[in-house]
Amino acid sequence: MEETGRNGEEMERTLVWGHRGASGYAPENTMAAFEKAVELGADGIELDVQLTKDGELVVIHDETIDRVSDGSGWVKDYAYAKLIKHNFNRTHPEYEHAQIPTLEEVYALIKPTDLTINVEIKTGVVFYPEIEERVLDLTERMGLMERVIFFLL
C-alpha cells in the first residue's frame, strides 16, 4: 500500500499493530482487545503465549496472572478450566468479565481477516517443553503459517 509523502513522492504506508490487541481500549490479550483491533482496522496484532498445567496454549503476557486478573499465581500451575474462572479485566475494569483466551480462539477470530499476527512465545522465565512445536503445529493446522511472525523470548 502506498501513500503520498510531504514531498509528493509515493511512500509505503505505515502499518498499525495492536499491541496485545487494542490494549488501550480493552483488557490486554483478551478477545475483546483483539476484536477491537480488528474493528479499528489494525494491520496486525501482537500477542504473547504461555502454557497451562494441562497443556493449553493461552494468550497472556506475564508468567503470572497477578497484574491482569483478580487472581494470583503462575500460569504454568493452573489448569485451563480453573484459569478461565478468573476475571482478566484488571487493566480495564469497565469490562465486566474478560477471560483469558486460548491461542486457537484468537486464531479463529483473526483467520477470516487479512491481519498479520506476531506471536511472542514466552520461554524466558518459565521453560515450557515443546511450546514452540505446539504453537507451530496449531498455526499450520489452522492454515495461518503465511500470516504469522514468530518471536521467542
Regions found by a protein language model. Give the residues of each.
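Phosphate-group recognition and catalysis centered on beta-loop-alpha active-site segments
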Residues: 1-153
